[in-house]
Structures are given as C-alpha cells and as structure tokens.
Amino acid sequence: SSDLKVIYFPTLQPLIEDNIPVFIKNTFDPSAEGTCISNSTKLDNDEIVKGISHIENISILNFEGSGMVGVPGFSKRFFEALSSNQINVVMITQASSEFSICIAINSNDAQLAKQVIDKEFEFEISQKRINESQIESNLANIAIVGDKMKSKKGISGKLFSSLGNNNINVRAIAQGASER
C-alpha cells in the first residue's frame, strides 16, 4: 500500500478496468479544472507532469556482496523473508551488476527488516560472501506523476536539477518502464 495523500491507488483499479474517469479537484478552489485520470490521454507538451507526490518516514536498506551475483532464487529469498514478516517494500533498486539491492521501507520497519535479512542470509554473511545489511533513515520517497513521460526527453533531468539546486541528494532511484 502507499501513503500518498491524494488518492489511494487500489481504489482506482475497478474504475480503470471499467474505463471510468476519475476527477481530482482542489477543495480550496472547486471551480478550478482539476485533474482527470482516465484511460485516454490528451496532453499538451507542458502538461506531461501533473504533480509530485511523496511519502515521508522512509528508510533504505542496502544489501550487497559478490555472493548474490548470478545466484538464482536470491531475490526470492530476500523478498519472502520481508513478506513473511509483513514488511512492505515501497521501492526497489538493483544494480545491473547484481552486486547490490536496495529497498525503501517505512522507517518503523527498518530495524526489523535489517534483523530479518541478516538472519535469512546469516550463512552467506558468515562466509563473507555478502555484507550485513545497512540502514539509512530520515528519508522521503518522491515521485513525479504524469503520463507519456517516457516519450518526453529531459523530464528526469529537470527533476534532478531541481533537487540538486535545492541541496537535496538522491539516495536511490527507480523508474518503471510502463506508463503506470
């Protein structure tokens, strides 16, 4: 689940399936046009990004080592250990080398997640094939919200420039290949 404040995404699924548009209005300015979420898109070039969402109280857990490179079932063990302890993963990044995996989780779950992962991979850690997991806290997860962003060059660049210009360091990055 997500902690985004605008709309709870699982409530959209039945509407998307039945092709029913959803209109989001500003309660402080109800006469404003608002935003329409639908299966059809009609966008001007400067309307690609519709907003920015965020989730506060985020920690990242980083797990790395050569012992995970090319090992079938590694990710399955990793995520099953978290899932069996009801730890929700907000974001996932993995290096293309398969040398590391990083997840964003609610900070309230951070210490439990570290214990669970270090216990699950206790043997690999003891053999120095994988390092103990590391936690970094006091973070937030931000996302730009829009449609047809993958066909518009420079969207990510503008986001990263804005963050850098405001002295905000990016700790992990994930971008889906789909438009949803």
Identify the residue ranges that each predicted region occupies.
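C-terminal catalytic "cap/lid" subdomain
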Residues: 2-180
